Structure formats: C-alpha cells, structure tokens
Design a protein with these regions (language model features):
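Beta-sandwich strand segments
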Residues: 112-118, 129, 208, 244, ...
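A short tyrosine-centered beta-strand micro-motif
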Residues: 194, 230, 244-252, 347, ...
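Short, surface-exposed loop/turn segments at beta-strand-coil junctions that are enriched for proline
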Residues: 187-188, 236-245, 338, 387-396
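Catalytic lumenal/periplasmic loop and adjoining terminal transmembrane helix
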Residues: 4-138, 151, 159, 190-199, ...
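A short beta-turn/strand-edge loop motif at beta-sheet boundaries
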Residues: 172, 186-193, 323, 337-344, ...
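Low-complexity, acidic Ser/Thr/Pro/Gly-rich terminal tails and inter-domain linkers that flank the onset
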Residues: 144-173, 279-324
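Aromatic sugar-binding surface patches on proteins
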Residues: 227-236, 378-387
Length: 422
C-alpha cells in the first residue's frame, strides 16, 4: 500500500529549512504559488478529499504552507515508476474519496508515461487544470456512482456525432461538481484541435458555470481522432460557491482552439443538454471560498457588499484584457446577508465620466430574479452578475463604476472601481 506523507514543520531538516528560505526569496520559485494553491484547498476541501504530490521535491515547500488534516499522497512512489503498482495504489487509496487536489511538478522526470494522470483521466472528472508558475494545479472529482448513459444523436459537422450523455445528478448545491460524460462517435479525421465547452446558463443567457477543455481530460485532442472511434469524454463542471439557487440550462459544443469558431449542428452552434437544479448548500460557504479582485466590505441596507470583480465579458481568465468602446463590462458582485427577512432589493450600476456625468446604467436584482434577497439566509454569501454595454462612440478615458441600492433610506451606494476605456 502507498505511504501517506505526514506533513508538518517538525520534520523539516536544517537543509530543507535553508531550501525553503531560498524558495521565499528567489523570484523563480516564488512564481510557483503554493500559498495560493493551499488557500484554495483549505477553502474548498472536505474531509472526504485527498491531495496528490508527484515529485519528492515538493514535500517540504508544500508542508510549510499546508497544516490541514487531509491525506497527502506521494505518487508515483518509485523511480522509475511502476505502472501496475501505481494504478493499484491509486484505486485503493482514492476509494471513497470525493475530490483530489493534484500538484504536478517536473512530470517529465517523475511520471514520464503519465501513469497517474492517465488513471485519473479514465476514472475521475477533471474540474480545473491551471499553471501556477511551474506547477500544474489540477482538481479532479471522483464519482460516487456510475451514471447511466442516455443516447443522443446530434451531429457536429463534419467531425463527430454526440451519441450519448451521462450526468452524475440532476440537482446539486453550489460549490459541488456536476460530473458529465459525453460520448463522441467520430465521423471524420481532422488536423485541427477543437475544445469542448460546457456552460450553465440562466434565463437571460448569463453564464454561471463554464468548462473549456480538450476531450478526455485533454488526453485525446481531436487531431488524434480516427473515423469510427468512440471517445468517452469526462468533464467536471464546478458550480461555484454562491451561485443562486434555481434552474439552469446546460449546453455543450465544440470550437476551434486556434480561432474560437464553433462547429455547428443542424440548427445551432451548441446542443442543449437539459435543465440542472442548483440548490442552497446545507452550510454557507466561508468567505475564503470566493475570489474577489477588490474587497469592499460595505453595508448597503440589509446586505454587505463584500467585494467585486470586473473584466470584459468572456475574459474572467484574463481580467487585465483592455476594455474598448462597444465592449461589455462584466461585474461579479459578492453579497452577504445581514439579517432575514429582507425585501427583494435591487441595484443600479452606472458608468460615470467627468464631473460624475452618467454614461450608461443598468438595473437588476442583487443576484438573480429567481433568488431575491428576501430568500437569503443570515450569513449566506451570494454571487451576483451584471453587464454594462459600453457605447460604441464612448470617448477613450478613465471612468468610475458606481452602484446604488435604491431600496435603502437614505439610498446607499459604493464605488466599485475605475476602468480604463481604450
């Protein structure tokens, strides 16, 4: 059986301590954001989860930051890796686990045949795969049961038919992962690499959850597909903490990774996979589970505006992308209920120019029309979204984003940042 690492500063040697000092002072090491990865693990993990490190050199650095109680698995355990032993230990030690937080570093040396990742791609659902400096931080969801495959017949010409769909559950609380299996029947070979996209949309087509990735945990790019093949394609779609309870449409499709152009079905550039019910979690998510560019902490009537993010719509992955005239400025707003019951409060967000002249404004509920603030529970954190369409003739310059909550007496408001329009 695999040995689980016992982490803690007690076991750090003098040599390791010196190495850690270099890690904190050398910018080349600082780019590997172990502190941030540990913060994510601490915010999202439950006692049913596990952590995976694939390189011995990670142990001391990771243990400096991580003080939790989750089992930390060191795999592969041998050099060179032994495939049969490694996969057997993965199956045994991850049995009954809910999620795996994997930190992959120097995989060309530690696992050149991708034994660990191949097993996870085949048995788990990849939720996130992001570089943190030289470390890949990957989150997997582990299925608790086998979901039945529903037959489909949707052609994404000329590449493939979507022949089947399996969903782990029809309803789940925010903060959980929807496990999705797509079955592709390949019709034609291609040299192009297409990504699969999955989106959870509300009635106004606002995106509340999204996953973009190459098929099969990115292990089977479409450039390797051959006519007649059947590709089992697993994806984990995280329903972010704070997503308002309600019913959402799940859609899927394929787009060219180089150009962004989508493949079409007979009548659209996506397929509707049905409705998913998002419910309120049994316990509120802690504040640490929410990523905010800017913290505000201002009470506006019966709610607190904790903070916000803003970026051009569609660029949450690159929020520094410049805004231009005619673009859509997207806002993520993080609210916390102070008390209950409350009235169904509304907000107005405006873009103000010189001398506080209002350029454009939008009004709407704090989070969603289907989950008014009157239904929030004390202490609950809810994520809202709102879009501001910038006029095509808007002069370039710096503008202020201002929010007001009209239902308060006097009317409460808050500045929510400056934006530069190019």
């Amino acid at each position: 059986a695999l040995a689980w690492l016992t982490l803690g500063l007690i076991g750090v040697s003098a040599g390791a301590a010196l190495a850690l000092n270099v890690y904190y002072t050398d910018s080349a090491f600082a780019r590997d954001d172990y502190r941030g990865m540990v913060r994510t693990i601490n915010a999202l993990a439950t006692p049913q989860d596990a952590i995976l490190l694939d390189a011995p050199g990670q142990r001391d650095v990771f243990s400096y930051y991580y003080r939790g109680n989750l089992p930390v698995l060191a795999l592969p355990a041998q050099r060179p890796p032994l495939a049969a032993e490694t996969t057997a230990n993965l199956a045994a030690d991850l049995a009954g686990k809910r999620r795996v937080y994997a930190l992959f570093w120097a995989t060309d040396e530690s696992d050149p045949s991708r034994i660990v990742e191949t097993w996870l791609d085949q048995h788990a659902y990849k939720v996130q795969d992001a570089w943190q400096g030289n470390v890949r931080f990957v989150i997997y969801s582990l299925p608790q049961a086998t979901a039945p495959m529903q037959p489909l017949a949707v052609t994404f010409a000329p590449l493939a038919d979507l022949a089947g769909l399996a969903l782990s559950v029809p309803a789940l609380p925010s903060g959980e992962v929807l496990e999705i299996t797509l079955r592709w029947q390949v019709k034609a070979a291609t040299a192009q690499r297409y990504k699969v996209f999955l989106q959870l949309l509300d009635g106004a087509d606002q995106v509340w959850a999204q996953r973009d990735a190459e098929p099969a945990g990115e292990s089977r790019p479409t450039s390797t597909w051959q006519p007649g093949e059947v590709i089992e394609d697993r994806h984990g779609l995280l329903i972010a903490p704070g997503t308002p309870p309600g019913r959402y449409r799940l859609i899927a499709g394929l787009y060219d990774a180089a150009t962004g152009v989508r493949l079409r079905t007979s009548d659209a550039d996506f397929v509707d996979l049905g409705l998913i019910e998002v419910t309120r979690p049994d316990a509120p998510w802690p504040r640490a589970a929410f990523t905010m560019q800017t913290v505000v902490d201002r009470q506006l009537g019966d709610v607190i505006l904790l903070g916000y993010n803003h970026y051009p719509r569609g660029f949450s992955h690159a929020p520094e992308t410049p805004l231009r005239r005619g673009d859509i400025l997207h806002l993520d707003l993080f609210w916390q209920a102070v008390a209950t019951p409350m009235q169904g409060q509304q907000m107005t967000v405006s873009l103000d120019g010189p001398a506080s002249s209002q350029v454009v404004s939008e009004a709407g509920p704090l989070a969603s029309a289907g989950y008014p603030s009157s239904q929030w529970q004390p202490g609950e954190i809810v994520r809202g979204q709102l879009d501001l369409t910038l006029p095509a003739d808007l002069p370039a310059g710096v503008y202020r984003v201002v929010m007001h909550v009209p239902g308060t007496i006097p009317i409460a408001g808050a500045d929510i940042g400056m934006v530069n329009i190019e």
